[in-house]
Structures are given as structure tokens and as C-alpha cells.
Amino acid sequence: MSDCLFCRIIAGEIPSAKVFENDHVLGFKDLYPQAKEHYLFIHKSHSKNVNEMDSTQLSDIFSAIKEFTQNNDLEENGFRVVSNVNKHGGQTVFHTHFHVLGGEQLKHFGS
């Protein structure tokens, strides 16, 4: 989708600070971090939100997040994975993406 920000990042039209890439998934640093370490993981196949993804795409994403967090010292102290869905869920970019936050003590939801 030519008007999709994340599709343009995947295509190399917009630069990103890549931290992970395989055949199906791209991970990069969030431009506006909400934690000491804040990354976005996206599937290279466009979908609007998590409800449009099939089980293979979900497995691809979570396998990538698992590999990344295990290899980058996030697993031991903990991290959070979040996906916002649609307007009321806080989604602002309509290409399914998962936020991976860590590197510090995170606040509890609702705090």
C-alpha cells in the first residue's frame, strides 16, 4: 500500500533504525519512545490490525519478538508487548504493529 507509512519503511522508501529483520518481519526503534527501549515489530504483509492477521502471520511476529528479546537482554528483567487496535484502542498507524517496551521498570496500566 503506497500510502501506508510502514509499507513504505518495508520498501526502503523511508529510513528506519532497524533492529531485526527476516523474510517476514521487520523490527525497528520507535521514533517517539515511551520507555528506555521501545521497538516496533511489523509483518511485511500488510494488514490493518491484529484481527486481520492469520495464525501464520501472528506466529511470525511473536517468533521474531521472542528471538529479539532473548538475544538483546530484555528477557531477564522483563518487557511488555502491546498492539493497539483501531481508534478507541489508540491505533494511529493502520498497519498491524506490536510495541516492545523494556529496559526499565514499566508503569502498571492505569497508573
Regions found by a protein language model. Give the residues of each.
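HIT superfamily nucleotide-processing domains
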Residues: 1-111
